[in-house]
């Protein structure tokens, strides 16, 4: 049975105007020009040092109309940074109070949203200006865990402006980073990380059976012979039905046999294979 989930943690932003495509092309890590109309991708907006202040799901309607989905907890600062130079272009950024629905499984044929964003073979996001006749039967945590399992990263206030896009594996996801388009904010750092091997970090998935929660921005522990030392940064953490799912940014050269655990816990974390390759 399909699950319909109200994605209340997200804010929808409509970007429109004669310069919308050109403006976003100079701001985001994706190639906005080459993104097909009706297509969606994760993308990031960086500061001048190449550190991400926001991760967006970008949806292109046309060269003059786009939608961005972003977590509400990073919205104020993230959006302010994105539209900082918009005053010089014919582009507007408007918050839309639309219904945002995550669907896992088949969509009902009777539901006809304004827009449908295909995330993968099993998941989609429906955007509608008014309320759709949907029976919500899934918790938002289910969607968050699905993101973790798919290796789709999350940025929170605790991790804003801390990581370059490759540290959260964006080079391996959808059309999140273009290394061939022109300049954008932070582009030099992102390119250097690829072509000079400057990036030494990657995001990994872990799970453990426990009732514990984990704090985003905190560390885990790694075993070194008879001792344990702190390592990594937790960027996503969701406990669903007694299973704690984590995304952790760590050094990208960790051994597959390395042992990890939560802070102040004797229970070992189980490393889950990423659904994509992070080899650049």
From Swiss-Prot:
InterPro entries tied to this protein: GCV_T_N, GcvT/YgfZ_C, YgfZ/GcvT, YgfZ/GcvT_CS, YgfZ_barrel
Residues forming coiled coils: none
Transmembrane parts of this sequence: none
Disulfide links within the chain: none
GO biological process, one term: iron-sulfur cluster assembly
Pfam annotation, one family: YgfZ_barrel
Gene3D superfamilies membership: 2.40.30.160, Aminomethyltransferase beta-barrel domains
Record-linked PANTHER family: TRANSFERASE CAF17, MITOCHONDRIAL-RELATED
Family in the record: To E.coli YgfZ (UP14) and B.aphidicola (subsp. Acyrthosiphon pisum) BU435.
The protein's name: Uncharacterized protein HI_0466
């Amino acid at each position: 049975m399909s699950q319909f989930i109200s994605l209340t943690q997200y804010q929808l932003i409509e970007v429109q105007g004669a310069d919308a495509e050109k403006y976003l092309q100079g701001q985001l890590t994706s190639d906005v020009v080459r993104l097909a109309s009706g297509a969606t991708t994760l993308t990031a907006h960086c500061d001048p040092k190449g550190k991400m202040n926001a991760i967006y799901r970008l949806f292109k309607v046309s060269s003059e109309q786009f939608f961005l989905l972003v977590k509400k907890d990073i919205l104020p600062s993230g959006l302010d940074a994105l539209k900082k130079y918009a005053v010089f272009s014919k582009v507007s950024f408007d918050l839309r109070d639309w219904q945002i629905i995550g669907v896992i499984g088949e969509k009902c044929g009777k539901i006809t949203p304004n827009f449908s964003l295909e995330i993968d073979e099993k998941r989609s996001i429906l955007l509608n200006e008014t309320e759709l006749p949907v029976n919500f039967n899934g918790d938002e945590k289910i969607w968050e865990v699905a993101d973790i399992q798919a290796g789709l990263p999350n940025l929170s206030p605790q991790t804003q402006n801390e990581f370059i896009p490759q540290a959260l594996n964006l080079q391996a996801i959808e059309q999140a980073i273009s290394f061939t388009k022109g300049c954008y904010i932070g582009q030099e750092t992102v390119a250097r990380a690829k072509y000079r091997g400057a990036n030494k970090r990657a995001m990994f998935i872990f799970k453990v059976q426990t009732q514990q929660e984990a704090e985003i921005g905190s560390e885990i522990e790694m075993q070194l012979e008879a001792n344990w030392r702190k390592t990594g940064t937790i960027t996503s953490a969701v406990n669903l039905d007694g299973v704690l799912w984590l995304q952790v940014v760590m050094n990208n050269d960790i051994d597959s046999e390395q042992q990890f655990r939560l802070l102040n816990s004797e229970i070992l974390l189980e490393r889950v294979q990423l659904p994509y390759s992070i080899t650049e």
